[in-house]
């Protein structure tokens, strides 16, 4: 059971809720804060004070006063009119993350909602009812209005949801789970949709996948090093300590561990004096991506525990302030950085693929073909990888440098953070396929060298992946191999259990 309190949710907690489906509850202390904040809203409505979003319209209509008898209609109309999302729905994991993050944000006690609304969010999580939320339509300020409006639609029994593997009207899922739709009152519609939970949820999923992919890239690169009889000296501890980046040192240490008893690696001067940069500089390049991942994780965990509503209620209602915490710029920047970090893993991987298939760069059969000329082997796999890498470069253009004014220029600067998160997710999917191509080529190269000469770790990895992708004995439709291995990479932890603690804790000499 994961307990939410509005301030201590971590990426590890989120992973347990999103992928292990651990149930969620709210802490008693956080619910007390929510009750006090709600009491302030009810006083404001009764006293007919002029407070944005409670007794006024929204955006450019902030100067329009709303009568207290119209308060519920105001919130319902807000949800209906703002549910303007378009395009394919977010993956269910993202929808689930949005429920989690919105509940956690409301539990900070600054938004003025009833505890019943938080109960509804948690009930959807625990019953695995996931709103259908279109991916496109958010400017990333004033928060993720359109996506979160579709989430709110589901909470009030409208719209669609994913439930038990099917897409259906929300009302059908509520009938099957004996849940009742929520009825929104003062401030609650605004509190649900004024926030950054779409970009943060998408960014969280992208980060979790990118972290796994970064580890996988090192293991696949280790197979490539063996397939190319790479020089192990470049991973020596002293050279990386001389530069001082911890992430670079960590990557080098993991590579040394993976290849510790390999008979396929060489030393400088044995076959050549130096390897190409795509081999020799793996710790420097991959380590830089790890640095970026650390930054992204830090910003995500702040935002996952942030109050991003407007206005916010402080001191039990004595202070109510309209501000701009809904602005997604911090996450927009983080996601743009994540795009670059993931794209670079694909860039260097594709160059290693070229070194595996180009007969001018190795002593392997041309394109790793079993019968060069008659059969093309891995020739077009490199094309596919190059295409994905090029697409990544286009997607990596920063979304956060763009802004288009909206709401009659009241909202005259926006973050485009949700676009950045969506593109990060796509780049990571592309990078996974590039790494799958590298793995297929590395497997074939190692097979030519003799897999019995592999290090103990990479030999186990070789056999695990050979269960997914068989040896290339003749040309076949390699698209299937790429997709199957990519799917496996997405699902597998990729760390043999007996090595997990050594590699992932300080006991193994690593800081990560």
UniProtKB/Swiss-Prot annotation:
PROSITE patterns: PAL_HISTIDASE. InterPro entries: Aromatic_Lyase, Fumarase/histidase_N, HutH, L-Aspartase-like, Phe/His_NH3-lyase_AS. GO terms for cellular component: cytoplasm. Pathway: Amino-acid degradation; L-histidine degradation into L-glutamate; N-formimidoyl-L-glutamate from L-histidine: step 1/3. Contains an active site 4-methylidene-imidazol-5-one (MIO), which is formed autocatalytically by cyclization and dehydration of residues Ala-Ser-Gly. Coiled coil: none annotated. CDD domains: PAL-HAL. The modification 2,3-didehydroalanine (Ser) is found at residue 142. It is found in: Cytoplasm. Its main location: cytoplasm. The keyword Cytoplasm applies. Keywords: Cytoplasm, Histidine metabolism, Lyase. Belongs to the PAL/histidase family. This is Histidine ammonia-lyase.
